[in-house]
């Protein structure tokens, strides 16, 4: 969110959209996740066509998920920058996870076991990606560094 504020970009969150879809009574499952990605892709494309920069908050752990954003960029002529935020210190990662509350009703906060499972299945990147290890950085420091890096590209 901070990067979007710093850059004047539109912020779109997969989890917020998924939470809204689940609030409509649809059963949780991979189909809802795909629907959330496709919904955000459509919103991103509309905003890109209007000339807005877009920051999408998504895990993007698979090639299929990443292709969603390549498609949006190709359809709109926009450039794309993938950013991977990670926490190399496992204890710090667990600490942050235990204190996390995104105020979502239907999309729960992941457990440490969920994070470990997802990490095991995380697809290698085929794109150029800006990677930030946030283990020793505060959120605003990460956002400032990321904003500075993106402004030079």
State where each predicted segment sits.
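Conserved substrate/cofactor phosphate-moiety recognition/catalytic segment
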Residues: 1-52
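Hydrophobic anchor at the start of a short beta-strand
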Residues: 9, 54, 80-81, 129
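Conserved nucleotide-binding/hydrolysis micro-motifs of P-loop NTPases
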Residues: 16-18, 61, 86-92, 136-138
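Glycine-rich phosphate-binding loop used to anchor ATP phosphates in small-molecule kinases
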Residues: 31-80
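Hydrophobic alpha-helical packing elements
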Residues: 36, 65, 93, 138-142
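Short, hydrophobic alpha-helical segments
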Residues: 48, 150-153
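Conserved phosphate-donor/acceptor-positioning beta-strand/loop module used by diverse small-molecule
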Residues: 76-97, 132
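Small-molecule kinase domains that catalyze NTP-dependent phosphoryl transfer to phosphate-bearing small molecules
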Residues: 100-145, 152-153
